[in-house]
Amino acid sequence: MSLARTILWLSRPLRPAHSLCRAQFMERKAQKPPSPPAMENGTRSWEERPPADPVATVTEGAAKIVFPSANEVFYNPVQEFNRDLTCAVITEFARIHLGAKGIQIKVPGEKDSEKIAVDLSDQEEETAGKNENLAPGDWPRTAAVGEICEEGLRVLEGLAASGLRSIRFALEVPGLQSVVANDASARAVELMHRNVELNGVAHLVQPNQADARMLMYQHQKAPERFDVIDLDPYGSPAPFLDAAVQAVSDGGLLCVTCTDMAVLAGNSGETCYSKYGAMALKSRACHEMALRIVLHSLDLHANCYQRYIVPLLSISADFYIRVFVRVFTGQAKVKSSASKQALVFQCVGCGAFYLQRLGKASGDPGGRIKFSAACGPPVTPECEHCGQRHQLGGPMWAEPIHDLDFVGRVLDAVTTNPGRFHTSMRIQGVLSVVTEELPDVPLYYTLDQLSSTIHCNTPRLLQLRSALLHAGFRVSLSHACKNAVKTDAPPEALWDIMRCWEKECPVKRERLSESSPAFRILAVEPRLKANFNIREDANPSSRQRGLKRFQANPEANWGPRPRARPGGKAASEDLAGRRRLLQNKRKEPAEDPAQRAARLKTFPCKRFKEGTCQLGDQCCYSHSPAAPVASGDIPIEECPETTTKISPGPKAAAGGIPGPGVD
């Protein structure tokens, strides 16, 4: 068969197949496919639609939100405790604020009989009978969750991200007039609109796109101010504080979160000063000092506008701190702000600290308060206990950081309605410890700090607390540290107690350097005779009841999340690997072995000069007589190749030259 006939024969069966495929394609295009069931979003599977962004759904409290799985909108589930506590605090603030207007709030799951104790006397029964005859419009007004209260609170969340916090306010906090959920990101505002519609709170929550500072500056006038401002930024809130203290109403509530704990805890004192106007110190009480520095910064900003703060609750939890303060206006009260701030003198050796107030307020016979400069310093140039120098920190807030009456109200509300929040048990534990803290005693010591200073065994918590109570001092725990010792005992009394404890668990004095803090502290005989017998009141109530005071790590790789970035990677994507990559990035790299060997060869070998070096070329030091001698720079390092101990030469035995080594 010829080549042309072969090609013609092979092409014959292909033509019908090609025609059949084309006919089937045209017929399929003309036919309408069967209608499959609609999906949840109302789109059928056969319809052409743009690919949707991958989203994740989160249910927290009464709110349900969706947010991109990519790290485009910031969300951290570990801060659920923060949001639960904020809802509880704003609820009690609304109860106080609206109660003055005769409006009673209704909280889901809360019984009126549990919240208000009613003792019906004869007169009250008559009043109750009169109320039955009142017109419906004259009955006491109430505010419920999810309803607009015309005289209620105007709330601003300056950095709302996904809008979760604002939506929870609308669904869980009664007595609200409006909630403005603001964010500078267009993507975040778009997501907020979606979540607001999803939860059915569009009548209360108003998503807004603007710079948080400009928005607050635009609401400086008294009629336009917000009753509650919530600031939960990524990192430091310092850029927003000046605008916040102006935009909150008189007596309004300001809620601020700080997650830049590395700065506030003393790692970068100069950075802390540039942001908050105070120097942070590295100390065991760094978390409480961070709270007091933020309160000082808030009061300092408010004083510029004849305003001042009153702290309601200040919490250090996990990797952040959270403060709730009320802001008032009053020129006379502002004058006392200087006397509420203090500098901190802290010994670098034993850790003893002293406070120096910036101002002094004293009363005159006429009943007026006179303000003057304080006198100081309260310390000598060297520590009287260990002889070391002092570091200067602050200024910081030196007044109470909690309003115990308000904290008690929040604690009672959470205790009587434990099902309201997912973290109710932790809120009860933390607030219980807060109510036990000494309000007029700033900062604290820790058990391990006291014992490690004098190199002795650590006493039990109840033993040290009992010794302080037997000596006539007050002592408490701190919510910021589980082994804290907050006491009004002066440092000399505290070290006397530790000296008495050391006598029961002696330290080998011959192993202590004469210039060490331990040697100098233990060289003094105690004037106070400590009694370590356990007292019943040494064990705090929160500890006896086994409350959840200090939570363990909630999940793996918990802590601060990456900053939200448009089109960024998911927050959990290779997060552990990135942390390993950036770990110790500021440390100097290890010296290369070859470079180290070359560096050591620049120093002469002392044993070679004495004629006792038996290593020859294997010695890590130079055997050249003309090798340069760099006095003061010669390291005292043993040669790594040395395997046997070489006895010193005759000059070394006579005391002219030290033992084996390098000059």
Curated annotation (Swiss-Prot):
One of its GO terms (molecular function) is zinc ion binding. The keyword Cell division does not apply. A zinc finger (C3H1-type) spans 599-626. InterPro entries: SAM-dependent_MTases_sf (IPR029063), Trm1 (IPR002905), tRNA_met_Trm1_C (IPR042296), Znf_CCCH (IPR000571), Znf_CCCH_sf (IPR036855). Residues 56-498 form the Trm1 methyltransferase domain. Dimethylates a single guanine residue at position 26 of most nuclear- and mitochondrial-encoded tRNAs using S-adenosyl-L-methionine as donor of the methyl groups. tRNA guanine(26)-dimethylation is required for redox homeostasis and ensure proper cellular proliferation and oxidative stress survival. This is tRNA (guanine(26)-N(2))-dimethyltransferase.
